[in-house]
Amino acid sequence: MRVADFSFELPDSLIARHPLAERHGSRLLVLDGPTGALAHRQFPDLLDYLRPGDLMVFNNTRVIPARLFGQKASGGKLEVLVERVLDSHRVLAHVRASKAPKVGAVILIDGGGEAEMVARHDTLFELRFTEEVLPLLDRVGHMPLPPYIDRPDEGADRERYQTVYAQRAGAVAAPTAGLHFDEALLEKIADKGVERAFVTLHVGAGTFQPVRVDKIEDHHMHKEWLEVGQDVVDAIEACRARGGRVIAVGTTSVRSLESAARDGVLKAFSGDTDIFIYPGRPFHVVDCLVTNFHLPESTLLMLVSAFAGYPETMAAYAAAVEHGYRFFSYGDAMFITRNPAPRGPEDQA
């Protein structure tokens, strides 16, 4: 299976660089995986596709203002993008500078703050700050907008590049399917008899890294930390018992649940995952998916293709482009029912 199979033409004008005025104001492309049928709706119409007894699983990670600007004490500007918070004072981070800082180098943070480079781990730098990391980031950090948004972060991004139910700080990218939900819509979903549960997956900057191999089977995913609690396992078992569907809000929720069920049995799990879901891999937990539109040749598009079927997914994306849907993090959304017999690129006639 080749990465190029997942390419498609996307006009630059369809990349959403700012959020809409209202979270729920986006459009919703509904894809019935078993038939490939499409319906063009508005996001609040998601209610029409939910049933009493269903369970929606959300990712409650909270995006941290992970981008810092500063300079080495010896001179030279640099940019720091925190990848993972290790403890109250230490992080793993990407550092962009004309010359990489050496062990022992001191970094002076714009706005106040100081860190020392204490170790290097492949492409990541371990930094130790002189004050607690999370309060420092809240004070002087910038929201880590994806590279395709291609603009400086603004004050509004602190609210809008964050779900309304975000709780556990640690992500450097938003679980963007959740950005469409406001409190009023969540209340209507609950009123319909739909249950909810929360997993945590701290999305890393690697989610934006391109696939650099020709065959997708040769690709190795970056690691991200997740937690699926026993309460989630119990909620899913109860959902199954009453005949409900498990609806994942976002690919991060899918990856969390399927990581916790890698042997086919869902169990509570806390730790790193590098799960890579592409056509041919079975799903053990998720029945339906709410997700945004993803980048060409991305691992997330491959995940959607595994869920809905490759020809159905690529046809849906072609329809989305034709109808002017907005793409990527601040863009529109899809609601997908899983295809029980998905085909891959090699199965095309």
Swiss-Prot record:
Q: Name one GO molecular function term.
A: S-adenosylmethionine:tRNA ribosyltransferase-isomerase activity
Cellular-component GO terms for this entry: cytoplasm
Identify the EC number(s): 2.4.99.17
Into which EC class is this enzyme placed?
A: transferase
Instruction: Give the pathway listed in the UniProt entry for this protein.
Output: tRNA modification; tRNA-queuosine biosynthesis
GO terms in the biological process aspect are: queuosine biosynthetic process; tRNA wobble guanine modification
**Subcellular location per the Swiss-Prot or TrEMBL entry:** Cytoplasm
Q: Which InterPro entries match?
A: QueA (IPR003699), QueA_dom1 (IPR042118), QueA_dom2 (IPR042119), QueA_sf (IPR036100)
Q: Which UniProt keywords apply?
A: Cytoplasm, Queuosine biosynthesis, S-adenosyl-L-methionine, Transferase
Quickly give the catalysed reaction. Answer: 7-aminomethyl-7-carbaguanosine(34) in tRNA + S-adenosyl-L-methionine = epoxyqueuosine(34) in tRNA + adenine + L-methionine + 2 H(+)
Recorded superkingdom: Bacteria
What is its quaternary makeup? Monomer.
Q: What does this protein do?
A: Transfers and isomerizes the ribose moiety from AdoMet to the 7-aminomethyl group of 7-deazaguanine (preQ1-tRNA) to give epoxyqueuosine (oQ-tRNA).
Write down the HAMAP family for this protein, in alphabetical order. Answer: QueA
Sequence similarity? Belongs to the QueA family.
User: Protein name, please?
Assistant: S-adenosylmethionine:tRNA ribosyltransferase-isomerase
Q: Upper taxonomic classification of the species?
A: Bacteria, Pseudomonadati, Pseudomonadota, Gammaproteobacteria, Pseudomonadales
